[in-house]
Amino acid sequence: MSRFCCFGAGCSEFSGHASTSSGKGKGIQGQVKVSYGFYLVRGMTNHPMEDYHVAELAEEKGNELGLFAIFDGHLGDTVPAYLQKNLFANILNEEEFLTQPDRAIIKAYEKTDQAILSHTPDLGQGGSTAVTAILLNGRKLWVANVGDSRAVLLKGGRPIQMSTDHDPNVERSAIENRGGFVSNMPGDVPRVCGQLAVSRAFGDRNLKSLLKSEPDIKVEDIDYTAELLVLASDGLWKVMNNQEVVDVAKRFKDPQAAAKQLTAEALKRDSKDDISCVVVRFRM
């Protein structure tokens, strides 16, 4: 049976057996016209789709918000599904959200992770990355992330990486200080205790003593030089660099078409993982 899932002005049809899903929407925040589109493709794997997204224009206490996210799950889809439903709500419910957004985001990430861990019997032993972008009144963009899902802003004609790839090798010292290790097997990526390919994530109860869910956060002004934002799971970033991604995306006025083309290009480059992509365009 199909179900309809609408985000802001966009609407997409999802089917339990479908290998793709897509949608788009648009609105105005202050002087900025915002349009967005998303496209998701299930990878060449035996498990169900583990990538989830959010793409929505909303209003909170008289403020106009753009809420965009990618959640890339592992060992099941229960944790990314939980994040899709709860993470932004938890951020917006923080009293400090409008006065100290950075602090509110960090607190909400931690509270959400604790809630996931407390629901382990229901949510299982899996986990998820997260990259979240909040556009406030068309003027400020906050991006936070844990894991290797990435956000890149095209501004002033150049790509600005708004997220941090949490690589086990980079955080090796912290992992070892907590009693863990990082494996580097030939032909494989670095992994925490030979298992997880990221050093920060939601969930992952069995590795939680070695992992953090504290996000890195970056803030940028959105002005006339800001053209577009791309959020995607590592199914895209494993085979395309930041410059290549924005070069493809900027060719399309329709952000949904841009997202679809990016996933097609990743598949052409032999990406086997789930691929999820959200493209947001800004126009003054």
Curated annotation (Swiss-Prot):
It comes from Oryza sativa subsp. japonica (Rice). Keywords: Hydrolase, Magnesium, Manganese, Metal-binding, Protein phosphatase. The keyword Magnesium applies. Residues 35-282 form the PPM-type phosphatase domain. The keyword Hydrolase applies. Belongs to the PP2C family. Mn(2+) 1 binds at residues 72-73. It catalyses: O-phospho-L-seryl-[protein] + H2O = L-seryl-[protein] + phosphate; O-phospho-L-threonyl-[protein] + H2O = L-threonyl-[protein] + phosphate. GO terms for biological process: signal transduction. Its cofactor is Mg(2+); Mn(2+). One of its GO terms (molecular function) is metal ion binding. Binds 2 magnesium or manganese ions per subunit. Transmembrane segments: none annotated. Mn(2+) 2 binds at residues 72, 234, 273. Its EC number is 3.1.3.16. Pfam families: PP2C. This is Probable protein phosphatase 2C 41.
